[in-house]
């Protein structure tokens, strides 16, 4: 094999390792959604209270993403990733042996702390380690890894939880993370911090109206999604009256739609980023609005879940690339803010869904989410109408160099 070919294969192996890490981080972030009823039962708590682990996780990430990013802005990235994975593994082992609910909450806080840095630095790192002519495909592979978390991670985690208990699911996640740690140790080169930004970057970033609008949109639209999605498992069991196995299959379909969204993203995003994001938001709004109606029949629930997944995955892909586009000079700081705001949305959505359940009933979580989504859709249109001329639709060559 020629040295060039060997180097290229090693670069692809690094990208795939990041995609695998994305799979594990996304799986563990959302696995409580699939195990919520089992966790509640094991601690003799109502589901609405157990949902606190989703809210706490999200808010820890939202509060710590930017401070931790700034504290580690100059840290060498390979060593930082290895240290993060050590804490990630130890936190999952604590989840396995958690003797009461609050110990589990503490363990999830540990995982959330690793999350707060991992997603702040990963998008720019995967571009750096990829072959020079395959940087956009590298982001696509990372997105596929995240989508596979929904396709395989959540359904398999749920199945493992059903047969062996929810603790076994966390134990297996820890084992996979050990494998990823070894791969990072073997494959990654020395990675000095690059274009991370600093505290001085904040005033500059906050003078960019398109970026600020994107952050506001992120909080609103993610809140809309998680108002319903945080409680989709009890919704399917109690409102759709599905069996446990059928509910697991619906989660599989939801995840499968993420692959479809990734393919659509690669095909259409560059031709019209704003149109792509608008389409995805419209799809999310429609599916949330129709959630209760679709729940009356199993086949309509499957169909709606598939389109719902395309909508939210398309939004996530589009917004992440848009952040990199609008802040190529401070990618890690901009992504840390994005990750923090995204998780504010998750926590707010889970909390709002909890309140809707308690005051109006589980059946109305979709309608409540749709109202938020409409607000986000209107905000996005207004911001683009007023400030859209300030940014080109495609990354310039110079911006690509800065991102890479």
UniProtKB/Swiss-Prot annotation:
Give the principal location in a single coarse category.
Answer: membrane
Name recorded for this polypeptide: Probable sugar efflux transporter
For this UniProt entry, the molecular function terms from Gene Ontology, in alphabetical order, are:
carbohydrate transmembrane transporter activity
InterPro entries recorded = MFS, MFS_dom, MFS_Efflux_Transporters, MFS_trans_sf, Sugar_effux_transptr_put
In this record, what's one Pfam family? MFS_1
- In this entry, which stretches build a coiled coil? none
Which HAMAP family does the record associate with it? MFS_SotB (MF_00517)
Q: Membrane spanning segments where?
A: 15-35, 51-71, 85-105, 109-129, 137-157, 168-188, 209-229, 245-265, 276-296, 299-319, 333-353, 363-383
Q: How does it sit in the membrane?
A: Multi-pass membrane protein
Known Gene3D superfamilies for this protein? Answer: MFS general substrate transporter like domains (1.20.1250.20)
Q: Name one GO cellular component term.
A: plasma membrane
Chain's gene name: sotB
**Record localization:** Cell inner membrane
For this chain, the family text in UniProt reads:
Belongs to the major facilitator superfamily. SotB (TC 2.A.1.2) family.
What are the UniProt keywords, alphabetically?
Cell inner membrane, Cell membrane, Membrane, Sugar transport, Transmembrane, Transmembrane helix, Transport
Role summary: Involved in the efflux of sugars. The physiological role may be the reduction of the intracellular concentration of toxic sugars or sugar metabolites.
């Amino acid at each position: 094999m020629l040295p060039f070919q060997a180097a290229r294969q090693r670069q692809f192996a690094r990208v795939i390792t990041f995609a695998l890490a994305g799979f594990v981080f996304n799986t563990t972030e959302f696995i409580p959604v699939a195990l919520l009823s089992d966790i509640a039962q094991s601690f003799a708590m109502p589901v609405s209270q157990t949902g606190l682990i989703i809210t706490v996780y999200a808010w820890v990430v939202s509060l710590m993403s930017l401070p931790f990013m700034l504290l580690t802005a100059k840290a060498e990235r390979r060593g930082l990733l290895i240290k993060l994975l050590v804490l990630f593994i130890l936190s999952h082992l604590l989840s396995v042996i958690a003797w009461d609910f609050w110990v589990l909450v503490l363990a999830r806080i540990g995982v959330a702390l690793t999350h707060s840095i991992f997603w702040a630095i990963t998008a720019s790192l995967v571009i750096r380690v990829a072959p020079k002519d395959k940087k956009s495909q590298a982001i696509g592979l990372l997105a596929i890894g995240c989508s596979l978390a929904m396709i395989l991670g959540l359904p398999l985690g749920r199945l493992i939880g059903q047969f062996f208990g929810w603790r076994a699911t966390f134990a297996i996640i820890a084992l996979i993370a050990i494998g990823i740690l070894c791969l990072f140790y073997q494959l990654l080169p020395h990675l000095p911090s690059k274009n991370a930004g600093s505290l001085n970057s904040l005033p500059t970033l906050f003078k960019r109206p398109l970026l600020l609008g994107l952050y506001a949109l992120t909080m609103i639209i993610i809140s809309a999604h998680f108002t319903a999605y945080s409680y989709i498992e009890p919704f399917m069991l109690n409102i759709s009256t599905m069996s446990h196995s059928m509910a697991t299959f619906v989660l599989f379909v939801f995840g499968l739609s993420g692959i479809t969204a990734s393919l659509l993203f690669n095909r259409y995003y560059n031709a019209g980023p704003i149109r792509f994001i608008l389409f995805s938001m419209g799809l999310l709004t429609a599916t949330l609005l129709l959630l209760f109606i679709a729940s009356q029949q199993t086949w309509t629930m499957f169909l709606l879940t598939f389109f719902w997944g395309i909508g939210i995955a398309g939004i996530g892909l589009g917004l992440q690339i848009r952040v990199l586009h609008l802040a190529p000079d401070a990618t890690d700081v901009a992504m840390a803010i994005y990750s923090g705001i995204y998780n504010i949305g998750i926590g707010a959505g889970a909390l709002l869904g909890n309140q809707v359940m308690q005051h109006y009933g589980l059946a109305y979580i979709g309608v409540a989410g749709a109202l938020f989504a409409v607000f986000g859709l209107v905000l996005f249109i207004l911001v683009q109408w007023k400030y859209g001329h300030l940014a080109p639709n495609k990354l310039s060559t110079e911006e690509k160099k800065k991102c890479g």
